[in-house]
Swiss-Prot record:
Similarity field: Belongs to the AP endonuclease 2 family.
The record's free-text note on cofactor binding: Binds 3 Zn(2+) ions.
Family annotation (PANTHER family): APURINIC-APYRIMIDINIC ENDONUCLEASE, ENDONUCLEASE IV ENDODEOXYRIBONUCLEASE IV
Cofactor(s) this protein cannot do without: Zn(2+)
Superkingdom of origin: Bacteria
Signal peptide: none
Gene3D superfamilies in alphabetical order: Divalent-metal-dependent TIM barrel enzymes
Organism whose genome encodes this protein: Lysinibacillus sphaericus (strain C3-41)
Name of the molecule in the record: Probable endonuclease 4
Alphabetized GO MF terms: deoxyribonuclease IV (phage-T4-induced) activity; DNA binding; DNA-(apurinic or apyrimidinic site) endonuclease activity; phosphoric diester hydrolase activity; zinc ion binding
The reaction(s) this protein catalyses: Endonucleolytic cleavage to 5'-phosphooligonucleotide end-products
Broad enzyme group: hydrolase
Role description: Endonuclease IV plays a role in DNA repair. It cleaves phosphodiester bonds at apurinic or apyrimidinic (AP) sites, generating a 3'-hydroxyl group and a 5'-terminal sugar phosphate.
Annotated HAMAP family: Nfo
Length: 297
């Protein structure tokens, strides 16, 4: 089973540091941003320490790593041409960096229509993806299932299907299935994950799922809020998430935790990563809330 988390990529070690961090959590895969998700400042590809990072990954069985595109990309924006243009150009450069890292999946929030309506936003996303995918790289864009917060597009399987169907080179598109987002969008993954997966299969095809984001949710189903919670501590719950992680149709897919860091009881500003504990729980199929509580000190 491929199970890991979001890790940082920074400093001099860059990819090597990412692999070391993932190893410390007991992971065998991981997800990274190639720089800060809030801006376009990026180190040169030559400074990502790729060779040493890949060597460490090989030595420790790290495979199927995933890149996440930055939040600032919004190719669904019909109101500001400069925002759309930045999104297309920067996504193309991020795909180039993803290929250099030898990752095959870059996760993308499809975009927000900023008031123009979902149909207009989806049309703009299709336009942007058609331009981005005109350049050939061995990388798929994994469109993420969204919670429906604000004017997000991709809040339903139907919206994602419409985007995929409209893109010319849609063999270069995949899907990142986020448990928190899907739950918050209204899908009953707690009581009927197989039914949800069957619905996805009919509209898009389960074979399109190439990344799973495994997150609990702070919100009730259908809240359209997108607030992640630690595994077993939210409205989805451990049993449902454990079922997803061990689902026979999804075994070969990298599963990435994006759960919140745990604040210390003595100092809320100091926080600990929960990933080692959560990976241990999911690998053993045993909910151990005391592991998370222990992180509070």
């Amino acid at each position: 089973m491929l199970l890991g988390s979001h890790v940082s990529m920074s400093g001099k070690e860059m990819l090597l540091g990412s692999s070391k961090e993932a190893l410390s959590y007991g992971a065998n895969t991981f997800m990274i941003y190639t720089g800060a998700p809030q801006n376009t400042r990026r180190k040169a590809i030559a400074d990502l320490n790729i060779m040493n990072g890949r060597l460490h990954m090989k030595e420790h069985g790290m495979t199927n790593i995933v890149v996440h595109a930055p939040y600032i990309i919004n190719i669904g924006n019909t109101e500001k041409p400069e925002t759309f243009r930045l999104g297309v150009d920067f996504l193309q450069s991020e795909i180039e960096r993803t290929a250099a890292l030898e990752a095959t999946q870059i996760v993308l929030h499809p975009g927000a229509h900023v008031g123009a309506g979902a149909d207009a936003g989806i049309a703009k996303i299709i336009e942007g993806l058609n331009e981005v995918l005109s350049q050939d790289y061995p990388v798929q864009i994994a469109l993420e299932t969204m919670a429906g917060k604000g004017t997000e597009c991709g809040r339903s399987f139907e919206e994602l299907a419409k985007i995929i169907d409209g893109v010319t080179h849609n063999e270069r598109l995949s899907v990142c299935f986020d448990t928190c987002h899907t739950h918050d969008a209204g899908y009953n993954i707690v009581e009927d994950f197989d039914g949800v997966l069957n619905e996805f299969d009919k509209l898009i095809g389960v074979d399109r799922i190439k990344v799973l984001h495994i997150n609990d949710s702070k919100n009730v189903r259908g809240a359209a809020k997108d607030r992640h919670e630690n595994i077993g501590f939210g409205h989805i719950g451990f049993d449902a998430l454990n079922y997803v992680v061990h689902h026979p149709q999804l075994m070969a897919i990298p599963k990435i935790l994006e759960t919140p860091f745990v604040p210390l009881a003595s100092d809320a500003k100091s926080k600990s990563a929960p990933y080692k504990a959560e990976i241990e729980m999911l690998r053993s199929s045993t909910f151990k809330p005391e592991l998370i509580e222990a992180l509070k000190g």
